[in-house]
């Protein structure tokens, strides 16, 4: 069976699909990278917010339109299916097979049988198997846990991802060791909430233990941690990230808002002052630390006063990177039933206003790197420039660095930063 895999959604889906590709190859199937060569196309979907659902539906119909030309079987899997299986099966009969949130071995079994598989409870924590790169790049996402027990009122993820389920430190270490042998230079740890890693297995927050284990591995590489829930970002986790030399000093902390009223409605436990104190303490200990966050505007009940409070919060913290998203009303969440919905046009205006403010802040924050030497990871080439990132940027969500000089994908180079705009930097090899 020749299988093509198309991934939508978050980096956790990318990690899952690379494991699935490895399982299928182990079973004798061929992984192809062009749908015209495939007997089966597997489309992995996202169902987090309305935009993600719309993108998934659009992609399903794009692949349906191409079926007659290329004669492949279309299999749709993942979060959208886990959440809306009955409706999808009824409304889109052109799809040949539906698979929910399932362990890669079980997905492979279902593909071989040709039967639908949507469990009542998600099953996505797997033991490590050899991965196959679906894209050529010098970094890899490693999923350390799945599911979430936090109960944020706006979030639908627990309804289709289930409760927290962590992989063992030994299993994750095995995966990372293999990735390093294959030449990966950056290991990016992902989960719905990385701060909760290990609570179910070890009865404690085990992220510091995992980081220490990975930091002890041989080789020159970066370790990056994403999705640090602010309510449970402890002093021990912060200290481990600041003290371990291979862990980049990059803190992805999705605070979601800066108004105490809205934070409480969101089900968050830390106040804006507590958030400020925590984030400021990171900068006090490591002034160059990069702080990234995510913000939701237009949450039910958000007034102009709340929004102004949010802007003051953002100005005070001076985040290096910030993603701003309009609230998505998701059925099955607590927030779905809240009154005082914000007009979509008002929410969109607030998003644009916040992003303009952040562009000024980001531009100012990058000034500190002008004239300095930074370690640079080559990811490709664009015209006369090498393109890649320093430790200050995460892939896909942040800017990039354009560098004059020679190098190949996966090289670490020392570069001098010469200029920047709000998001990207330019420099040259020293």
Swiss-Prot record:
It is found in: Cytoplasm. It catalyses: L-aspartate(89)-[ribosomal protein uS12]-hydrogen + (sulfur carrier)-SH + AH2 + 2 S-adenosyl-L-methionine = 3-methylsulfanyl-L-aspartate(89)-[ribosomal protein uS12]-hydrogen + (sulfur carrier)-H + 5'-deoxyadenosine + L-methionine + A + S-adenosyl-L-homocysteine + 2 H(+). [4Fe-4S] cluster 1 binds at residues 10, 46, 79. Its main location: cytoplasm. SUPFAM superfamilies: Radical SAM enzymes (SSF102114). [4Fe-4S] cluster 2 binds at residues 148, 152, 155. It is an enzyme of class 2 (transferase). InterPro entries: Elp3/MiaA/NifB-like_rSAM, Methylthiotransferase, Methylthiotransferase_CS, Methylthiotransferase_N, Methylthiotransferase_N_sf, NA-bd_OB-fold, Ribosomal_uS12_MeSTrfase_RimO, rSAM. One of its GO terms (biological process) is tRNA modification. Residues 367-430 form the TRAM domain. This is Ribosomal protein uS12 methylthiotransferase RimO. It comes from Thermotoga sp. (strain RQ2). The lineage of its organism: Bacteria, Thermotogati, Thermotogota, Thermotogae, Thermotogales.
């Amino acid at each position: 069976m020749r299988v093509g895999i198309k991934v939508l959604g978050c980096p956790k889906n990318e990690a899952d699909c690379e494991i699935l590709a490895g399982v299928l190859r182990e079973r004798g199937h061929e992984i192809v990278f062009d749908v015209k060569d495939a007997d089966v196309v597997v489309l992995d979907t996202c169902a987090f917010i309305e935009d993600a659902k719309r993108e998934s539906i659009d992609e399903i119909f794009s692949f349906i339109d191409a079926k007659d030309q290329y004669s492949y079987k279309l299999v749709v899997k993942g979060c959208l299916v886990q959440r809306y299986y009955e409706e999808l099966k009824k409304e889109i009969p052109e799809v040949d097979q539906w698979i929910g949130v399932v362990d890669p071995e079980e997905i492979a079994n279902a593909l071989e049988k040709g039967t639908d598989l949507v469990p009542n409870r998600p099953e996505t924590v797997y033991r490590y198997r050899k991965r196959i790169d679906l894209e050529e790049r010098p970094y890899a996402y490693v999923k350390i846990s799945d599911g979430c027990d936090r109960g944020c009122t706006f979030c639908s993820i627990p309804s289709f991802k289930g409760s927290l389920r962590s992989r063992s430190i030994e299993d994750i270490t095995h995966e990372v060791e293999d990735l390093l042998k294959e030449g990966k230079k950056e290991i990016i740890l992902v989960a719905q909430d990385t701060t909760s890693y290990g609570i179910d297995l070890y009865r404690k927050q085990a992220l510091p233990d995992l980081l220490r284990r990975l930091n002890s591995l041989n080789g020159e590489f970066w370790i990056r941690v994403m999705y640090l829930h602010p309510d449970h970002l402890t002093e021990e986790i912060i200290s481990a990230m600041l003290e371990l030399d291979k862990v980049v000093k990059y803190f992805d902390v999705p605070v979601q808002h800066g108004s105490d009223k809205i934070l409480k409605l969101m089900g968050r436990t830390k106040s804006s002052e507590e958030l400020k104190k925590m984030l400021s303490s990171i900068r006090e200990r490591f002034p160059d630390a990069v702080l990234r966050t995510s913000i939701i505007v237009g949450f039910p009940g958000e007034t102009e006063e709340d929004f102004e409070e949010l802007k003051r919060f953002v100005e005070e913290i001076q985040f290096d990177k910030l993603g701003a998203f309009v609230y998505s009303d998701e059925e099955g969440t607590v927030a779905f039933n809240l009154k005082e919905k914000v007009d979509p046009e008002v929410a969109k205006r607030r998003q644009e206003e916040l992003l303009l403010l952040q562009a000024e802040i980001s531009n100012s924050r990058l000034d500190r790197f002008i004239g300095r030497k930074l370690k640079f990871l080559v990811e490709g080439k664009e015209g006369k420039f090498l393109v890649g990132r320093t430790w200050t940027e995460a892939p896909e969500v942040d800017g990039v660095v354009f560098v004059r000089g020679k190098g190949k994908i996966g090289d670490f180079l020392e570069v001098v930063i010469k200029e920047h705009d709000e998001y990207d930097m330019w420099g040259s090899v020293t």
